[in-house]
Structures are given as structure tokens and as C-alpha cells.
Amino acid sequence: TDLRAFARLGEEGVDLFMTDSTNAEVPGFTALEKDIGPVLENLFGHAERRIIVASFSSHVHRVQQVLNAASAHGRKVALVGRSMVRNMKIAADLGYLDVPKGVL
């Protein structure tokens, strides 16, 4: 974290800067978002049986990646959980989620 950059923001008049990140307190690095899609594609292409993916119900981009990988390999996706189903319906209705025909 570039603490000097945060200090400069304060000097420029920013009174409050808030951010949140899952596992921010855990040392090390996580994979970049752009790296996840190819991993899912590989997994969906090579797994011989059922694949179970867990995700936050607010992570529309991750669900899109799963839908794309499933579609590319002729697999089906089942959304489980009231929040997941509701959020993905809203995302699809607003055009933020493209559900390939026959995948859900």
C-alpha cells in the first residue's frame, strides 16, 4: 500500500477515503481478475464430473465468467440461494449479465 499517496490525498483536501477488500488483512497477493476466466475455462473443459463454484451473490462478473465457461463447454449452471438468484435476475434485467441460452 502506498501510504505516501494516501497522505497526498489528505494534503489535497480529501477528508475521508474508505475502501474495503476481502482478506485485506492476509499477507501476500491474490490472483488478478483477468486471470480467473482462463482458469475457469480450463476447469470446465477438463473436469469429468460436476463442478461446484462458490461466489458472493454480488459478484456479477464472477458469475458471468462461470456462465461463459459453462456455455463454451456445453455445461449447465444452477444458481443456489435466494440472494444469488435475486441478484443475478436483477443483473440480467439491467443488462449487466448475459445469460447464454440454455445454460441456466
What are these regions (language model features)?
Residues T1-L104:
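His/Asp/Glu-rich metal-coordinating catalytic cores
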